[in-house]
Amino acid sequence: MANIPMDIITDLFLRLPASTLVRFRVLSKPCFSLIDSPDFIASHLNHTLQTGDHLMILLRGPRLLCTVDIDAPDKVSDVEHPLKAGGLTEVFGSCNGLIGLSNSPTDIALFNPSTRQTHRLPAEIVDFPEGSTTRGYVFYGLGYDSVSEDYKVVRMIQCKGGKADELVFGFPYEIKVFSLKKNSWKRIKRVLPAIQLLFYFYYHLLYRRGYGVLACNSLHWVLPRRPGLIAFNTIIRFDLASEEFEILDFPESLAHENIDIGVLDGCLCLMCNHEFSYVDVWIMKEYKVEGSWSKLFRVPKPKSVESFDFMRPLLYSKDRDKVLLEINNAKLVWFDLASKRFRKLRIKDCDSSYSVELLVSSLVLGCRGDPNEVKRRKERRAREDKLMQQSNKRDDFLSKGFKLVL
C-alpha cells in the first residue's frame, strides 16, 4: 500500500466497517495514525450515517447479547462486553455506535461493540433526598450533544424509604448527567415546577422501563396517564445542550390514548395503540412545532401474534416501501406500506424474546474513549521501542562476538 496515495486510502477506508478498520491499523504506521485520528473517526461516522451502510441490530435477551447484520440476518455475532457478570446487564441506549451498559446505578459503561473499546464511568453515589434511604426505579438515557460534541448519560433515580414512604403519591427523585469529555457527573437541580410536580407525585416512565428516546439533540420520555391520578399523557424532553427539562407538545387528541415514543428516519415518532387491535404511527416533521405532527401510517394487529401490546417502527427499507417493526419484544417483521402485509425477519439461532436497538458501525471511542488511553499507548510504544533497541544491541553484540571467534 506504500505506493497508493493517502487520499485514495482514506476514501477507501471510509467505506469499510469499523471492525475491519481495527484490523487494518496494523498494516502500517500511516494507517494506524489515520484510523486512530479524531478527524477520520468523525468522517467515518458521518459517512456511515449518511449512507446507512453497515447497519446492525443489537439483540438483548435473558442470556443473549448479539449483533445482526440487517442485510444478512444469518450473520450473527455474540457480544462479549466488559460488564458481563452473574447479574442481568441492561442496555439502555444506542448512539453513534456506542451502547450504554448498566449493572447498577454505580456500575455503568459505554461500549463500542465494533471496536470492543470501553469507557467505564466513574462510580457515582446516589445523593438521597432528605427522608429517603433507598432507591426505587432507575431511568437512563444516552445521547450525543452536537453542540458541545460530547456524549452524555442521564441517570434519574426515584428514591424511597423513611419519611418518603409516608407520601400518598410517588417519591422524591435525583437526576445526574455524565459528560464523557469531562469524565464526571453533574447533578441537575433546576427543574421546571410543572415537571417537578409530575416527577414528585407520579413517576412512571414508559419505553423499556424508562430508557430515553434520542432525537434532535434531546432525550424523551412519556409520563403516561394514570386513572384517578393524572388524566392525560405527557412527553418530557431533556435538552442535552442546555441540560434542562421541558414539556413537548403533541396532538391533544392523543392525550388520553395509550401512547409510546420512538425514532423513525431521524424524527421523533409517536405510536398510538388503539385497544390493542391496531397502532397509528405519528411523526414530528419539524421538531418542537406542535402543528408538524402528522399521522404516517397504520399497522393492524398481525395474525401471528396473540396480543398487540407493543409495537415500534425501527427503520425504512432502502426502497422505502417497507418498515421494520419490533413487536412485543419478541418479533422483528417487515411491514409493506402498500399491501399491509407482514414478513418475519428470521434471525439465525434466535427464537427467544429480546429487546432491540439499532447500531451503526463506528470507531467512536477508538482513540479517545478512555482519557488515559493515549498516555498508556505512548508508554507502551516507548517500552516496545526500548525492547527493540535492546534486542538490536544484543544482535550486534552477538554478531561481533561471532566475528571475533571466527
Task: Describe each model-derived feature in a short phrase.
Residues M1-L406:
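N-terminal entry/capping and adjacent linker segments that precede and initiate structured domains
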